[in-house]
Amino acid sequence: MSERHLPDDQSSTIDPYLITSVRQTLAEQSAALQNLSKQLDSGQYQRVLNLIMNCKGHVILSGMGKSGHVGRKMSATLASTGTPSFFIHPAEAFHGDLGMITPYDLLILISASGETDEILKLVPSLKNFGNRIIAITNNGNSTLAKNADAVLELHMANETCPNNLAPTTSTTLTMAIGDALAIAMIHQRKFMPNDFARYHPGGSLGRRLLTRVADVMQHDVPAVQLDASFKTVIQRITSGCQGMVMVEDAEGGLAGIITDGDLRRFMEKEDSLTSATAAQMMTREPLTLPEDTMIIEAEEKMQKHRVSTLLVTNKANKVTGLVRIFD
């Protein structure tokens, strides 16, 4: 790749006004959000929330251009928080994809002007199907608004774009409205972390909320007998690489554990170590986790008791493995 494709960001002088422009844009968008919050029509929002809550089908988003991109995000947020939803492109809908829509679906149509041709072309068909329509627009007197069952206005003075052309403030406001509706539904549906995890099984949260310790535990638990010597205990802790060792009774059951910390504390108070046994050093009745414990519960228990490793037991109370907080 030639040097001209790798410009040195220190070689060019940036006009200080550009930084001022960045600050101004952020300030203007923030002010627009504040203005929307103050001017929103609570009656219209109540109607919209009721329509979403009582929808028996899908909440379908549609918009052209940048409004379409925002609509996709809004749909994804609704779907991931318990409200079945998908996005449909208005042009594709007008050429066959209307077949994806059932009479039980609720449509949210996005158009800042309220006069987007591709959006307006959908309205007669939607009304014929019997669908309810929610309009998100900056023009409460637009054709779209007049044909909607509920209208959420942006109350925007102008776009942040210096030419008042590129969708900037309007997309920010629309995105915020989508998030506000989704959050309201989370409250209404009492949508909890466990519910969220069901729709995000591949993410970190989903793993922690849906995975049990039996699924991730290590089965090879370092162990010593009650009469094991101090030297044997150290060797087993070292070779086991877990920072602890399980102490077994005569029947192979759990008698206790010895951690690195237990060893240090024992060494501080005992003068003679050559005759010490595991029974003298161990912590009796250590904390354990049932195999069906969720990972998130295991993490909470470890953090509460300030430990990094816990033994896992089966229904017969036999040790079957161990789990670490960083597994």
Curated annotation (Swiss-Prot):
GO molecular function term, any single one: ATP binding
Binding site for Zn(2+): 89
Subunit structure: Homotetramer.
Domain (CBS): residue spans on this chain: 217-273, 282-327
Official protein name in the record: Arabinose 5-phosphate isomerase KpsF
Family: Belongs to the SIS family. GutQ/KpsF subfamily.
Residue numbers marked as site, Catalytically relevant: 66, 118, 159, 200
Protein's organism: Escherichia coli
Keyword vocabulary terms for this entry: ATP-binding, CBS domain, Isomerase, Lipopolysaccharide biosynthesis, Metal-binding, Nucleotide-binding, Repeat, Zinc
Binding positions for substrate per the UniProt entry: 82-83, 89, 95, 121-130, 155-157
Class of enzymatic activity (EC top level): isomerase
